[in-house]
Structures are given as structure tokens and as C-alpha cells.
């Protein structure tokens, strides 16, 4: 499967709005069933001990896996997370978080994904979390989207 240029442009723009824009998420690459994103860590992202907050790590994993799924469904469908499980391996203390999301089992209505989150500091890259998701593909008409403000 190939993503046409209009769909690719839409997905790359759509991935950064609202909360993800506030967090500073940047899409790096998108191909069918795979999405890579990055966040430059700032003071607002850290918890009390100076590491990237676990909620931030979970958010980038969920969002990136969601858009990996979104790349495989028709334009008249949306992706919603049904459930996910995340394992944290070590604190994220780098300059960036980078997430690689991929669809492991596509389906018409249900998709299964994985996401790996890395902490990047200089040339060093360490795996800090891995998540598994179950995603639902639903008709866009069933999902009300607020305007982007």
C-alpha cells in the first residue's frame, strides 16, 4: 500500500494540533503502518526528579501508534484507542523523546500496534518504554472533532 501525497500531507499536518502541538510533537516520517515522532524535552515535560514524565511518554506512544494506524484506513475513518499497555524500562533523561509506532496486525475495524519510545541525548539513544495498543477504526461521521484553536 502507498499513501498518496494529499493523504500524507493531511496526516502529517493533522498529527500536530491541540495537545500534541502544546507538547511540541514533531512528525519525522510516515509510511503505511509506520509513524515516527519526536519531542524536544523542555522544563514543562519533567516530573519532580528531573526525568520526562511518564504521562508524556505514554502520550507520545499512544499518539504515534494511533497515526501509524490512521495511515492504513480510508479517509472517511478515524482511529480511537480501545486499550493500551505500556512498560517503562528506565528514566528518560535525554534531550529528546523519539517514538516509533507501527501496526503489527491491521484489520478493517480493529488494528493492533506497538510503539517504542527512546530517550536521545547527543549520539546516545536508549529504549525507555514499549507500548502495545488496540485501536478501533470508526466512521468519521461518528466522531465529532472540535475546531483547531
Where are these regions (language model features)?
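Terminal targeting signals and extreme-terminal segments of soluble enzymes
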Residues: 1-149
